[in-house]
Amino acid sequence: MHEQIMPLRCGHTICYLVQGPTGSLLIDTGFAESLGQLGSQLKMHALDLQIVDYLLVTHFHPDHMGIARDLVELGVTLLLPSCQVPFVHQPDHMYVRDHNRAFRPIREEDACRLEPEDSRKFLSAHCGIDGQVVQTPGHSPDSISLVLDSGDAFVGDLCPFDQVELYGDGQMRSSWEKLLGLGVHLVHFAHWPDERI
């Protein structure tokens, strides 16, 4: 595996920096106030925010996309699959309701559209990352995962594999079957410890 994986804790959300030979991809952000936390986490690894080339949000809940626009304004490219477009502004009302002045809504026109079927070619060309984006609904209808050829998968808030049967959710089961079919054996969650399958 030539990708380096770095977990970064932003509040209660674990974000991941996946570094390829030619570029890097941040998976998820924390809440709107977490830009400083992200910067501090990177600094602990002798890095800064300029290391981040692309951002992929596993699903549009407030604790996964809160600083997306801040990062875009710092030069990071937000990758946005069409399956997520209807959900981009879903968390906005929560920030407005809570009078959160740190939050700024995403501007869709600032995002780079990236369809899952094109993701392998894009990630290879722009980051040197061998992997692909796949739709994995279950936790939310807009959930996506990044699956690396190494067998690592970044699944956001998809429930752990060993709990799938507790939910009795066919969509969640189907998403896990898709991940297993792609050879996933090490799962990185946003709120759970890693799970080896």
What are these regions (language model features)?
Residues 33-35, 43-121:
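Active-site HxH/HxHxD metal-binding segment of metal-dependent hydrolases
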Residues 8, 18, 119-128:
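Short acidic-hydrophobic surface loop/beta-edge motif
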Residues 32-33, 126-197:
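Metallo-beta-lactamase
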Residues 25-27, 56, 78, 152-154, ...:
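Residue-level marker for buried hydrophobic side chains located in beta-strands
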Residues 1-45, 145-158:
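Conserved beta-strand hairpin/beta-sheet module of binuclear metal-dependent hydrolase folds
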Residues 3, 50, 76, 129-131, ...:
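A structural micro-motif
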Residues 38-41, 67, 172-178:
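A general structural detector for well-ordered alpha-helical segments in enzyme core domains, enriched
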Residues 8-9, 39, 110-118, 135-137, ...:
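Short gly/ser/thr-rich secondary-structure transition/capping motifs
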